[in-house]
Design a protein with these regions (language model features):
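Conserved nucleotide- and phosphate/pyrophosphate-binding catalytic cores
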Residues: 148, 154-319
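Short catalytic-loop micro-motif centered on adjacent basic/acidic residues
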Residues: 75-78, 141, 219
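Short helix-capping/linker segments at secondary-structure and domain boundaries
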Residues: 98-102, 134-141, 240-248, 278
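Short, polar/flexible loop-turn hinges at active-site or ligand-entry regions and domain interfaces
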Residues: 49-50, 139-143, 222
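N-terminal Rossmann-like or analogous alpha/beta NTP/dinucleotide-binding catalytic cores
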Residues: 2-130, 282
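Internal, conserved structured core segments that host functional sites
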Residues: 106-160, 164, 183
């Protein structure tokens, strides 16, 4: 079963990225054909700073690898190294009704938050469809906010298949319901756009500051606390097994500890969990040529599949 996901190189990764998508991909490497790419074309919808995009792409590659993506088990590449995706993007555009894109929630949300209402942003779901359909993807792990984009890809695939025959595999979105939306420090969905993240590869000083900023209620230190509605607990449970969650719940219900104590505990959890990944990340960033070699290795495998797919499409469309 082929599984594909992409992540924009738009800055430092946070724990929402990890628990919402990356961990699922790492865990699935033993069972499925994993295809993972750094979505630098998609990143251009929010920034056209070339040097920044290049550096962020290398940082994203180092992050993926340090968090457990194995280039021997997964196909791992830079989106722009497989040009066929842009060809397919244009072809799929001819099968995409304007109304389908006008209903996209993500476009409206991003424009409302200040992003330029460009054609690239508007047609973002078509490029995402090209990413997915080019590789005959069966499963696309996504957060709840991206389900609609996978549905759009499926709608486009159905339209093409009705015209040309069964040329595209119909993709399905897969959402891990337990961690699909990781809360940020303010209780909203964790997102760089909201500036409420806990970054994986930040310094210990920055990490402590981010965790200290988690919004809590005003329950007194000595009183029992509501763990179910506490942002600290919601984040901490991601790092704990069932037994650990139960122990933390008991501490909340017992009282005698303030939110400052729980923030210190969360800080320890995050530092311990990502210790090895941080060390590997820093080592990889010191070897950009090695990172490029790994991405090139994946791009060769991805291009071979993409070229074979495009040849079938050329025959259908008369190119």
């Amino acid at each position: 079963m082929r599984v594909l996901t992409g992540l924009q190189p738009s800055g430092d990764l946070h724990i929402g990225n990890y628990f919402g998508a990356i961990k699922q991909m790492v865990d699935a490497q033993e069972k499925s054909q994993m295809f993972m790419f750094i979505a630098n074309y998609h990143a251009m919808t929010s920034s056209q700073d070339g040097e920044k995009l290049k550096q962020n792409s290398l940082k994203a590659a180092a992050a993926f690898l340090s968090l457990g993506i194995d280039p021997q088990k997964s196909v791992f590449w830079l989106q722009s190294d497989v040009k066929e995706v842009m060809e397919l993007y244009w072809i799929l555009s001819q099968f995409t009704p304007m109304g389908l894109l006008e209903r996209a929630h993500s476009y409206k949300d991003k424009v409302a938050k200040g992003l330029s209402a460009s054609h690239g942003l508007f047609s973002y779901p078509v490029l995402m469809a090209a990413d997915i359909l080019l590789f005959d993807t069966r499963i696309v792990p996504v957060g709840k906010d991206q389900i609609q984009h996978v549905e759009i890809a499926r709608d486009i695939a159905l339209k093409v298949n009705n015209e040309w025959g069964e040329i595209f595999t119909l993709p399905e979105a897969k959402v891990n319901e337990e961690v699909a939306v990781v809360v940020g420090t303010d209780g909203a969905k964790m997102s760089k756009s909201y500036q409420n993240t806990i970054d994986i590869f930040s310094s210990e000083k920055t990490l402590k500051k981010q965790i200290s900023s988690i919004v809590t209620d005003s329950t007194a230190l000595e009183d029992p606390k509501d763990h179910e509605n506490c942002n600290i607990f919601k984040i901490a449970k991601l790092f704990l097994d069932e037994s650990g969650q139960k122990e933390l719940q008991i501490r909340y219900e017992k009282g005698g500890e303030g939110y400052g104590h729980f923030k210190m505990y969360l800080n320890e959890l995050v530092n311990a969990y990502f210790k090895e990944a941080r060390e590997k990340y820093n080592e990889l960033l010191e070897k950009p040529s090695h990172l490029k070699e790994i991405l090139d290795f994946g791009a060769i495998k991805a291009r071979k599949i993409a070229q074979e797919k495009m040849q079938k499409i050329y025959e259908k469309i008369g190119l």
